[in-house]
Amino acid sequence: MRIMGLDVGDKTIGVAVSDLMGWTAQGVATIRRSRLAADLEHLRELVKTYEVERIVCGLPRNMNGTYGPRAEGIRKFGSLVEKKLNIPVDYWDERLTTVAAQKTLIAGDLSRAKRKQVVDKLAAVLILQNYMDAKAHLAAKEQSKETSE
């Protein structure tokens, strides 16, 4: 099953997709946001192209674990995506993913201009990879529990 990860911002949406086995995430696009209908259509095309069966939206949380107004906006966007594209949407804690993406790009010695072009896509990769790793860990834990009983 292929999963899509989204880092939704006010100006751009970073997009990543998993491999068919759901092991690794790859960045595929940064959508420059315009109108909501255009954003949804662009996502629809990517869902179709990559045969995506589930979407994970990064959900911004405060460092104390609470949700702010941005999280509410992401949930509204995710609900629209789910309704209009007829695909399940999950949410994943995106705390510090953009910071981690920036640090990775700086360590890679990318120029500020190049970092700006790819940071949202890399943040989407981190959101999706963290989601898949957590799901794989839970599945392994469940399997281990079943075999020990």
Swiss-Prot record:
Family designation: Belongs to the YqgF nuclease family.
Subcellular location: Cytoplasm
GO annotation (BP), single: rRNA 5'-end processing
The keyword Nuclease belongs to this UniProt entry's keyword annotation: yes
GO cellular component, one term: cytosol
Main location: cytoplasm
EC number, UniProt record: 3.1.-.-
Any one GO MF annotation of this record: nuclease activity
Swiss-Prot/TrEMBL keywords: Cytoplasm, Hydrolase, Nuclease, Ribosome biogenesis
UniProt superkingdom: Bacteria
Name of protein: Putative pre-16S rRNA nuclease
Native source organism of the sequence: Heliobacterium modesticaldum (strain ATCC 51547 / Ice1)
Function noted in UniProt: Could be a nuclease involved in processing of the 5'-end of pre-16S rRNA.
